[in-house]
Amino acid sequence: MNFDYNKLLERASGVLSSKTKNESRLKIPEPDVIYEGKSTIIRNFIDITEMMNRDPEDVIKYLTKEFGIGAVLSGQRLIINRKVSEDEIQSKMNEYMATYVICYECKSPDTEIQKIGRTYLLVCKACGAQHPIRSNREIIENSNGIEIGKEYTVTIESTGSAGEGIARYQGYTIYVPKAKKGERVKIIIRKIKRNVAIAELADKK
């Protein structure tokens, strides 16, 4: 059976289109920063943490560790005990999002952190993925994406409406005709559109 990869890609993109509505939530507000003496004040700190749906104290612990300085919450504002540039603050906020908020699989921000034993897991409410919290370096090293014509090994996690296998890899949802749920298969990417890809089995008979 010959598959029309373009049609399959369009259908798959349509199925996942509702998930793209989350993209507007991926960008946190820019820090509203002012300086008083030697202190840096983020005036909209609580607005930022509410957008991320994370405990402000957890974000404060992350920032104080990254900057190596103390900080205190005062109402809606975070007061940092030395001057820090807006670019530095924005960079650390983005790193926090990538590490503790954004799903490593589908890139949805609808996640929560759960502790299982001694391990903290990032659990996605959108796709159901569960992964141990990674370091920012690990995320960067594993975020190179996929390329058309390249071969990858994936696990088929579910089945689409037309019977095609569905895998998730490097933030992409990959549709694989003839693949069955539970199989570990080698695939070749044929089409990519945003975070959706169509592949074929590398060892087709």
From Swiss-Prot:
Keywords: Initiation factor, Protein biosynthesis
Sequence ranges assigned to domain TRAM in this UniProt record: 145-203
Domain of life: Archaea
PROSITE patterns: TRAM
GO molecular function ontology, one term from the record: translation initiation factor activity
One Pfam family per UniProt: eIF-5_eIF-2B
PANTHER family for this protein: EUKARYOTIC TRANSLATION INITIATION FACTOR, EUKARYOTIC TRANSLATION INITIATION FACTOR 2 SUBUNIT 2
General function of this protein: eIF-2 functions in the early steps of protein synthesis by forming a ternary complex with GTP and initiator tRNA.
HAMAP family in alphabetical order: eIF_2_beta
NCBIfam families (UniProt xref): PRK03988.1, PRK12336.1
Self-association state and partner proteins as the record states: Heterotrimer composed of an alpha, a beta and a gamma chain.
Family, as annotated: Belongs to the eIF-2-beta/eIF-5 family.
Protein name: Translation initiation factor 2 subunit beta
Species: Picrophilus torridus (strain ATCC 700027 / DSM 9790 / JCM 10055 / NBRC 100828 / KAW 2/3)
Gene name linked to the record: eif2b
